A protein has these predicted regions:
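Key residue(s) within conserved catalytic/signature motifs
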Residues: 1-174
Length: 174
């Protein structure tokens, strides 16, 4: 295991933010969501910090899903969300049925027909709504932490979805 040096305060802040939305009083209340941005220079240990934090969340009974952004023009649209939603649905497969058609645009294995992926506003709205529903329903049974690593490399659709999820009331602690 890598040495974990000099990040105790950062880990404490992440833990406090998690507890603020997941633990009573004030937390674990319908509609609570939190957003924490971890910044720093390349190689400073952000991913190591988040890995340590994820271990704490899991030990506390929470769920953690990851998505990693690609650096470069070859990245598929929505890629970090495809990974995070795929992991969420793997852990809670019962959620897939209610959002299958909408999420098929970004989680291809959910498609029953060949989906058409475009930037049409209606498609984006359906994807945003379905992603929010999926994450909110997953968070209703246990606190859910979504980690989007290397967010500086995210495509605009992924950033827009993050904004939506962070501002939309959720039925659980997200």
């Amino acid at each position: 295991m890598l040495a974990f040096v000099g990040r105790t305060e950062s880990l404490a802040r992440l833990t406090a933010a998690y507890q603020a939305v997941s633990s009573p009083p004030g937390g674990a209340v319908s509609g609570w969501a939190g957003l924490v941005l971890v910044t720093g220079e390349a190689g400073i240990g952000k991913t190591t910090l988040l890995t340590r934090f994820a271990s704490r969340v899991r030990a506390d009974g929470g769920t953690v899903v990851w998505g990693t952004c690609w650096d470069g023009d070859q990245a598929p649209a929505w890629w970090p969300w495809t990974q995070a939603l795929r992991a969420t649905l793997d852990q809670r497969p019962n959620l897939a049925e209610t959002v299958r058609p909408e999420l098929a645009a970004i989680v291809p294995e959910l498609a029953t027909n060949s989906p058409v992926i475009d930037s049409d506003t209606a498609v984006r709205v359906r994807v945003f709504d379905a992603a929010g529903q999926t994450l909110g329903q997953a968070a209703a049974s246990a606190p859910l932490v979504v980690i989007l690593d290397d967010l500086h490399s995210a495509d605009q659709s992924s950033v827009d979805l993050l904004r939506f999820v962070a501002h939309e009331p959720q039925p659980g602690a997200l």
